[in-house]
């Protein structure tokens, strides 16, 4: 099952998404584009289980972290009643 995790440049470097991820997909890396001087990165997307806890934890108005579920997951989600 393959999910993609995208971190946008609206990230404020708060680390909420990193702490929320149960499978350690995300980590913080140095970045000069925000006050915190760090941004979330997703180096281990193969470990993503698609729970979207990172999205829920993101405090920005435009979610800085988005999880795009793989085709198998979205297909099985359509079977629910």
UniProtKB/Swiss-Prot annotation:
GO biological process: photosynthetic electron transport in photosystem I
Requisite cofactors: [4Fe-4S] cluster
Top-level taxon: Eukaryota
Disulfide bonds: none
Residues holding [4Fe-4S] cluster 1: 11, 14, 17, 58
Ranges for domain 4Fe-4S ferredoxin-type: 2-31, 39-68
Membrane topology (UniProt): Peripheral membrane protein
Pfam annotation, one family: Fer4_21
Primary location recorded for the protein, binned into one broad class: plastid
GO cellular component terms, A-Z: chloroplast thylakoid; photosystem I; plastid thylakoid membrane
Function summary: Apoprotein for the two 4Fe-4S centers FA and FB of photosystem I (PSI); essential for photochemical activity. FB is the terminal electron acceptor of PSI, donating electrons to ferredoxin. The C-terminus interacts with PsaA/B/D and helps assemble the protein into the PSI complex. Required for binding of PsaD and PsaE to PSI. PSI is a plastocyanin-ferredoxin oxidoreductase, converting photonic excitation into a charge separation, which transfers an electron from the donor P700 chlorophyll pair to the spectroscopically characterized acceptors A0, A1, FX, FA and FB in turn.
Subunit structure: The eukaryotic PSI reaction center is composed of at least 11 subunits.
Protein name, per record: Photosystem I iron-sulfur center
Species: Cuscuta obtusiflora
Name of encoding gene: psaC
């Amino acid at each position: 099952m393959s999910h993609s995790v995208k971190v946008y440049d609206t990230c404020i470097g708060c680390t909420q998404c990193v702490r929320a991820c149960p499978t350690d997909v995300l980590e913080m890396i140095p970045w000069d584009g925000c006050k915190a001087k760090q941004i979330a990165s997703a180096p281990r997307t193969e470990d993503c289980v698609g729970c979207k806890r990172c999205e829920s934890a993101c405090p920005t108005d435009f979610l800085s972290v988005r999880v795009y579920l793989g085709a198998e997951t979205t297909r099985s989600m359509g079977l629910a009643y």
